[in-house]
């Protein structure tokens, strides 16, 4: 993925007529600006899926993402994911249970990444000043610190769950527990000591955030006739 943008703007005043829409024809040209931006991203995905006798199910994915929003030191992020499932209702010992319609245990783990929004946030930026700043001469002032080691924010997710259904799928239960861990958090405008010559870093990696909990969902169809159907559902969860 590659995106390039070029732009030009002109600000003027004292137009000779409201019927003239070209700002360059105005009496006073106040400001002329131009610029360009360039962003590149490259990604790849490898995936392997396995299924045996409709009982044992597995999936493995590996994703690699590279972005020009990061410095050359930390440009690439590697994000794996794996999931395994066992449909125990297909086993001979459970097939004898006539009231059991379906049953599955599953476990999964995966990672995803987050990047900054602006492709130039990692670059050093300099401003030019008015001539009165230093002995009536213009000067160049550093405005933003270059971030060579800025890296991907990573979210790791674990999930363990069970799906089970009874009585021709008229009663189904889904239960799961999960844990999410966000590492190398991306902090926007992170404050730093003024003795550094700056007040903030545009982005800073630091810290982690953990989120875990459980959820239970129950659905029932106690009445299912030609002209009447009753659906009941119940959900409870806790997040820490």
Give short role names for the model-derived ranges.
Residues 1-240:
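Extracellular/periplasmic, surface-exposed regions of secreted and cell-surface proteins
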């Amino acid at each position: 993925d590659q995106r390039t943008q070029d732009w030009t703007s002109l600000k003027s005043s004292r137009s000779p007529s409201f019927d003239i829409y070209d700002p360059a024809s105005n009496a006073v040209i106040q400001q002329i600006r131009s610029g360009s931006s360039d962003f590149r991203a490259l990604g790849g995905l490898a995936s392997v899926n396995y299924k045996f006798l409709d009982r044992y199910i597995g999936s493995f994915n590996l994703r690699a993402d590279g972005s020009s929003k990061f410095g050359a030191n930390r440009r690439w992020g590697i994000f794996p994911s794996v999931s395994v499932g066992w449909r125990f209702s297909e086993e001979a010992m459970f097939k004898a249970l006539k009231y059991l319609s379906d049953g599955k245990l599953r476990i999964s783990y995966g990672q995803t990444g987050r990047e900054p929004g602006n492709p130039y946030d990692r670059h050093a930026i300099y401003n030019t000043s008015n001539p009165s700043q230093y002995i009536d001469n213009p000067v160049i002032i550093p405005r933003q610190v270059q971030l060579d080691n800025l890296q991907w924010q990573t979210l790791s997710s674990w999930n363990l769950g069970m799906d089970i259904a009874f009585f021709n799928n008229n009663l189904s239960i889904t239960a799961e527990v999960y844990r999410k861990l966000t590492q190398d958090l991306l902090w926007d405008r992170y404050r730093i000591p003024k003795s550094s010559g700056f007040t903030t870093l545009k982005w800073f990696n630091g810290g982690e955030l953990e989120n875990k909990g459980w959820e239970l969902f129950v659905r029932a169809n106690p009445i299912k006739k030609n002209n009447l159907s009753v659906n009941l559902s119940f959900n409870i969860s806790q997040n820490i």
